[in-house]
Amino acid sequence: GSSFGPARRGRQTYTRYQTLELEKEFHFNRYLTRRRRIEIAHSLCLTERQIKIWFQNRRMKWKKENKLLSSSQLSAEEEEKTAE
């Protein structure tokens, strides 16, 4: 590609910086408060929705990597889905 911009082929591409920042946040917190999500969205020039989806995807990836999940963590995830 010639122009470097967000490739809108149905899938969001994140810059290396954005990915690193999101990974760093995820390392400390797998779940974001709405306030924190807004802060991150502003600092990374992303939408809240993008942050939310990135974290959802990241948690799914994390789950696959950590098959041995305690039931307490699973119930916390269910609570978040219904709190939408």
From Swiss-Prot:
Family recorded in the similarity comment: Belongs to the Antp homeobox family.
Record has Protein biosynthesis as a keyword: no
SUPFAM superfamilies listed in its UniProt record: Homeodomain-like
Gene Ontology CC entries for this record: nucleus
Claim: Disulfide bond is one of the keywords in the record: no
UniProt-listed CDD domains: homeodomain (cd00086)
Annotated localization: Nucleus
SMART domains: HOX (SM00389)
Classification of source organism: Eukaryota, Metazoa, Chordata, Craniata, Vertebrata
Function: Sequence-specific transcription factor which is part of a developmental regulatory system that provides cells with specific positional identities on the anterior-posterior axis.
GO molecular function: DNA binding; DNA-binding transcription factor activity, RNA polymerase II-specific
Protein name: Homeobox protein Hox-B6
DNA-binding region positions on the chain: 7-66
Matches recorded under Pfam families: Homeodomain (PF00046)
Major place of residence: nucleus
Keywords: Developmental protein, DNA-binding, Homeobox, Nucleus, Transcription, Transcription regulation
Domain of life of the source: Eukaryota
